[in-house]
């Protein structure tokens, strides 16, 4: 009887205090995805889209893209409700961690730390991890959608977790070298998760292995696979880690702008048609929304098959690092979900990819040949 009473009291505590992702109605949700649309002038009848705050949304309870009537700049959307828990939190009992390579409400930015953006908030029971691509977001004192985020497309994913998962989350973030602007670490969390103190002290992993992939189970039981890399690894997260690990060809949408010595990494065509990495060129969404990758700052991956006789592996990944030359020397990561319904929503979003150049195709062929020769003589 006493054990039953303790269980009931514990459940009451969880329902009253525990942090989770919230949906567009402010209700708890296991996970959600948002796709903030670019500033699209060709949708004058839709004010949020035309002013750059419109967004598509879906979550575990309704796996269909829904165009929301409100913009992301107002106080009645999933991101707002989720973050509001942090703004209303008790700092004595809440662990919170905000990182962004461009700090909000500031001109401070970093081109050497991890190219990573996110928020993680936990109490003793549960919490959430929100991974996104929005520069200068969120503010650490109140919800405000930054004006710089209106023009380009942005994406994010929020996942609810039991607090025991914070151990794995922290270990993954330890690879990033995050540019941290808010970190609240109650002593109870420091005692339970020692790596958090290292993160607070701006430490990060510098010794092999320089990459890590871990499976994380959400509060509702959904399995996600997270990929993390350090800048010291010096390779592309997508073509050198995600694709080979998933054993699949992938299409990748990331920032498609070049400047100075920072150039876009080319698409990589696998001569065996098993493990290509193709950069996005055009995006096509429901509701007659389409635009060039040049207008998008999102970072997401869609697995695909190059064989008509082999079905694609239903993986979708959402993260925060680009396929650019400079970013092979920066930390970052992506969160992948293996789910057929989610995959269906993403499968055709990347409507056209950047073709491989002759040089990259020849390099890929030579690499395969060298591997075959080395294997033969082993």
UniProtKB/Swiss-Prot annotation:
Provide the residues annotated with a glycan attachment (glycosylation): 51, 92, 111
Q: What is its EC number?
A: 3.1.-.-
Record Pfam families: DNase_II
Deletion consequences: RNAi-mediated knockdown results in accumulation of apoptotic DNA in 1.5-fold stage embryos.
Highest rank taxon of the organism: Eukaryota
Q: Which UniProt keywords apply?
A: Apoptosis, Glycoprotein, Hydrolase, Nuclease, Signal
Q: Report the GO molecular function annotations.
A: deoxyribonuclease II activity
CDD domains noted in UniProt: PLDc_DNaseII_1, PLDc_DNaseII_2
Q: Where is the signal peptide?
A: 1-17
Q: Which InterPro entries match?
A: DNase_II
Write out the transmembrane intervals.
none
Q: Give the PANTHER family listed for this entry.
A: CELL DEATH-RELATED NUCLEASE 6 (PTHR10858:SF24), DEOXYRIBONUCLEASE II (PTHR10858)
Entry function: Involved in apoptotic DNA degradation.
The family note in this entry says:
Belongs to the DNase II family.
Q: What is this protein called?
A: Cell death-related nuclease 6
Q: Which organism is it from?
A: Caenorhabditis elegans
Q: What is the lineage of its organism?
A: Eukaryota, Metazoa, Ecdysozoa, Nematoda, Chromadorea
This chain is encoded by the gene named crn-6
């Amino acid at each position: 009887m006493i054990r039953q009473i303790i269980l009931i009291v514990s459940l009451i505590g969880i329902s009253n205090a525990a942090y989770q992702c919230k949906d567009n109605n402010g209700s708890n949700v296991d996970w959600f995805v948002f796709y903030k649309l670019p500033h699209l002038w060709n949708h004058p009848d839709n004010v949020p889209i035309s002013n750059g705050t419109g967004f598509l949304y879906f979550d575990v309870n309704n796996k269909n893209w829904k165009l929301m009537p409100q913009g992301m700049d107002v106080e009645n959307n999933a991101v707002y409700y989720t973050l509001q828990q942090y703004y209303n939190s008790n700092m004595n009992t809440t662990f919170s961690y905000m990182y962004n390579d461009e700090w909000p409400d500031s001109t401070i930015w970093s081109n050497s730390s991890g190219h990573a953006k996110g928020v993680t908030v936990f109490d003793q029971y549960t919490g959430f991890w929100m991974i996104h691509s929005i520069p200068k977001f969120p503010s650490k004192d109140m919800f405000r959608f930054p004006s710089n985020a209106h023009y380009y497309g942005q994406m994010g994913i929020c996942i609810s977790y039991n607090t025991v998962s914070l151990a794995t989350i922290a270990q993954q973030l330890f690879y990033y070298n995050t540019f941290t602007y808010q970190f609240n670490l109650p002593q109870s969390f420091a005692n339970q998760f020692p790596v958090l103190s290292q993160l607070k002290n701006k430490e990060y992993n510098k010794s092999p292995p320089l990459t890590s992939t871990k499976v994380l189970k959400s509060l509702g039981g959904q399995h996600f696979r997270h990929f993390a890399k350090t800048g010291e690894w010096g390779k592309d997260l997508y073509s050198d880690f995600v694709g080979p690990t998933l054993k699949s060809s992938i299409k990748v949408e990331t920032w498609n702008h070049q400047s100075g010595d920072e150039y876009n990494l080319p698409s990589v065509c696998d001569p065996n048609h098993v493990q290509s990495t193709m950069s996005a060129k055009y995006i096509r969404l429901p509701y007659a929304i389409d635009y060039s990758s040049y207008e998008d700052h999102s970072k997401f991956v869609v697995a695909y098959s190059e064989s008509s006789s082999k079905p694609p592996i239903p993986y979708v990944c959402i993260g925060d690092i680009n396929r650019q030359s400079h970013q092979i020397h920066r930390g970052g990561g992506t969160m992948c979900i293996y789910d057929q319904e989610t995959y269906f929503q993403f499968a055709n979003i990347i409507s056209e990819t950047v073709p491989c150049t002759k040089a990259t195709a020849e390099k890929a062929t030579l690499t395969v040949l060298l591997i075959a020769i080395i294997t033969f003589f082993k």
